Amino acid sequence: MARIAGINIPENKHTLIALTAIYGIGKKRSKFICSIANIPEHSKIVDLNEEQIDLLRTHVAKYVIEGDLRRERTLNIKRLIDLSCYRGLRHRRSLPVHGQRTKTNARTCKGPRKPIKK
């Protein structure tokens, strides 16, 4: 398996799809990386030579990915909670942050129903 950014990339998949195994790289960014590196999107990782894989590594390294991206996201949420702004309070209470209704929906955020005690 080819290792890019510390992640084992599946070799039997097309380059476009294989790069999406890296957290922080979706299809759009993967397509952009392939076009910059002049690598066909539909060629499989097995068919690429070492130079092309090194080229992919250098282009992927330019982005904030994997652990750094996860850390950045958690620090952003922690910052909102520490500020006690509206979005931070919603995060703290595990409620929807972007103004969605909560009377009937939002079961995923709220968690399972709590029984009413009589």
UniProtKB/Swiss-Prot annotation:
Self-association state and partner proteins as the record states: Part of the 30S ribosomal subunit. Forms a loose heterodimer with protein S19. Forms two bridges to the 50S subunit in the 70S ribosome.
Protein name: Small ribosomal subunit protein uS13
InterPro entries: Rbsml_uS13_C (IPR027437), Ribosomal_uS13 (IPR001892), Ribosomal_uS13-like_H2TH (IPR010979), Ribosomal_uS13_bac-type (IPR019980), Ribosomal_uS13_CS (IPR018269)
Single GO MF annotation: rRNA binding
BP term (GO), one: translation
Gene Ontology CC terms: cytosol; small ribosomal subunit
Pfam families: Ribosomal_S13
Record flagged with keyword rRNA-binding: yes
Keyword set, alphabetical order: Ribonucleoprotein, Ribosomal protein, RNA-binding, rRNA-binding, tRNA-binding
Gene name linked to the record: rpsM
Organism of origin: Buchnera aphidicola subsp. Acyrthosiphon pisum (strain APS)
Region (Disordered), start-end ranges: 94-118
Gene3D superfamilies the record matches: 1.10.8.50, 30s ribosomal protein s13, domain 2 (4.10.910.10)
HAMAP family: Ribosomal_uS13
Similarity remark: Belongs to the universal ribosomal protein uS13 family.
Biological function: Located at the top of the head of the 30S subunit, it contacts several helices of the 16S rRNA. In the 70S ribosome it contacts the 23S rRNA (bridge B1a) and protein L5 of the 50S subunit (bridge B1b), connecting the 2 subunits; these bridges are implicated in subunit movement. Contacts the tRNAs in the A and P-sites.
